[in-house]
Swiss-Prot record:
Protein name: Indoleacetamide hydrolase
Function summary: Hydrolyzes indole-3-acetamide (IAM) into indole-3-acetic acid (IAA).
Organism encoding this protein: Agrobacterium vitis
Keywords of this entry: Auxin biosynthesis, Crown gall tumor, Hydrolase, Plasmid
Coiled-coil parts of chain: none
Domain of life the protein comes from: Bacteria
Keyword Hydrolase: yes
Alphabetical list of SUPFAM superfamilies matching this protein: Amidase signature (AS) enzymes
PANTHER family named in the record: GLUTAMYL-TRNA(GLN) AMIDOTRANSFERASE SUBUNIT A (PTHR11895:SF151), TRANSAMIDASE (PTHR11895)
One Pfam family named in its UniProt record: Amidase
Pathway(s) of this molecule: Plant hormone metabolism; auxin biosynthesis
Biological process terms in GO annotation: auxin biosynthetic process
Length: 467
């Protein structure tokens, strides 16, 4: 067994020949087998993984590029290795021979197909409590949700079953599970990553994203996926101007989350960060007008198109009829049967609310000369599995989906890059994450800022899933 470190550190150790690629792979396989109860992984090919590791060792180039690094791919991303099911029964036998360009770029750089990650069915939820494939469990407390919809990838990375992972994020689905599992989650500027051969929710909002142990790992994977290998230069904290839009993003926080956020802000201020407390005008109304109308309207059209292009043998009605998770079935059927979102509402959301939301962010950054904004990724920590519709938050019963996506949803709708960082643990030892967002196209600078914040915060905890 070899020590499991970050992806960046593992590459260094492989290059130094501290251990072989096969030894690394055997260690990860043993961890995956020991942590099966988390239900983080849907599909594996240990024989194939061992063969690929041995080939790398024979060639003597482990650690060059991404050679020797097993990754976890969310089950809605085509890899050419694992079934691309979106964790829904009708697609259980869907195994595209051609991988997505994201997977292809990573494999070309030497990354290994480690596993397929369990997820919320069809990406339509944030708990990863999937009635078809079973609930994914939070590695910090297996009775709690890991977040979603990329919950399996986040749980696998947090448990160090895999050295990194690729999820998808429509409104929360990379950053939220990263926050609840205590790892780093990155949603890039919309359009930075290829989107082909990924089972969609909303083309206007969907993007792949990265879940990793640290920002340095995100940078390595981002450079390969984006094809933009620009060096991330260190940024001093002193002189950074970071916005705190308190009225929306800091409202009604769980006490433990509020304490972690206040502690983080105080720490960073003491290190030289200038915080600007100012709200983004009309943000809540603009986001509400753009959010669900776009996603709900686009989903049936996007899924039908995917099935026509890449499946052929499974119809849209087949997929809908076989949905097992009640929360997903209720949402999807309401749109299909009742036309919950009309064409007029959709066009208003896409042509009016969304552009105005994007303009509100641009004006806010320009007015206050900001480098980023900072807020708690979620207003609350992980809650018990099974509370898919409603959850008690600060003494009130609230909608589970709405409360968890509240803070991460607006920047998703605006197409902005966002990076969730773990900042601490609650008294119950549950992770708390905080997100920084930047303007569209500022991904490199946002990652550099994230690396500087991460170094100052110095969160270094992982769950002990093997004991």
């Amino acid at each position: 067994m070899v020590p499991i470190t970050s992806l960046a550190q593992t590459l260094e150790r492989l290059r130094r020949k501290d251990y072989s690629c096969l030894e690394l792979v055997e260690t990860l396989i043993a961890r995956c087998e020991a942590a099966k109860a988390l239900n983080a992984l849907l599909a594996t090919d240990w024989g194939g993984l061992r063969r690929r590791a041995k080939k790398i060792d024979r060639h003597g180039n482990a650690g060059v590029g991404l050679r020797g690094i097993p990754l976890c791919f969310k089950a809605n991303i085509a890899t050419g290795i694992f079934p691309t099911t979106a964790a829904t029964p009708a697609l259980i036998n869907h195994l595209p021979k051609i991988p997505s360009r994201i997977a292809e770029r990573l494999f070309s750089a030497g990354a290994l197909p480690g596993a397929s990650g369990n997820m919320h069915e069809l990406s339509f939820g944030i708990t990863s409590n999937n009635y078809a494939t079973g609930a994914v469990r939070n590695p910090w407390n297996p009775s709690l949700i890991p977040g979603g919809s990329s919950g399996g990838v986040a749980a696998a990375v947090a448990s160090r079953l895999m050295l990194g992972g690729i999820g998808t994020d429509t409104g929360a689905s990379v950053r939220l599970p990263a926050a609840l599992c205590g790892v780093v989650g990155f949603r890039p500027t919309l359009g930075r990553y290829p989107r082909d051969r990924i089972i969609p929710v909303s083309p206007t909002r969907d993007t792949a994203g990265i879940i990793a142990q640290c920002v340095a790992d995100v940078v390595i994977l981002d450079q390969v996926i984006s094809g933009r290998p620009a060096r991330i230069l260190p940024i001093p904290l002193k002189g950074l101007r970071i916005g705190l839009p308190t009225t929306y993003f800091y409202d009604d926080l769980d006490a433990d989350v509020a304490f972690a956020a206040e502690t983080t802000i105080r720490l960073l201020a003491n290190r030289g960060v200038t915080f600007v407390e100012a709200d983004i005008p009309h943000l809540e109304d603009l986001n509400s007008g753009a959010s669900l109308p776009i996603a709900l309207y686009e989903f049936p059209h996007a899924l039908k198109q995917y099935l026509d292009d890449f499946v052929g043998t499974v119809s849209f009605s087949d997929v809908i009829k076989e949905i097992r998770s009640p929360d997903v079935a209720n949402i999807v059927n309401a749109q299909i049967d009742g036309h919950q979102i009309s064409n007029a509402e959709y066009e208003l959301a896409r042509q009016s609310f969304r552009p105005r939301l994007q303009a509100a962010y641009r004006n806010y950054f320009r007015l206050y000369r900001l480098d980023a904004i900072l807020f708690p990724t979620a207003p609350l920590a992980a809650k018990a599995i099974g509370q898919d519709s409603s959850v008690i938050h600060n003494g009130s019963m609230v909608n589970t989906f709405k409360i968890y996506v509240r803070n991460v949803d607006p920047s998703s709708n605006a197409g902005l890059p966002g990076l969730s960082l773990p900042v601490g643990l609650t008294p119950d030892r549950l992770p708390v994450g905080m997100e920084i967002d930047g303007l569209a196209g500022s991904d490199h600078r946002l990652l550099a800022i994230g690396a500087a914040l991460e170094k100052a915060i110095n969160f270094r905890s992982f769950p002990d899933v093997l004991n």
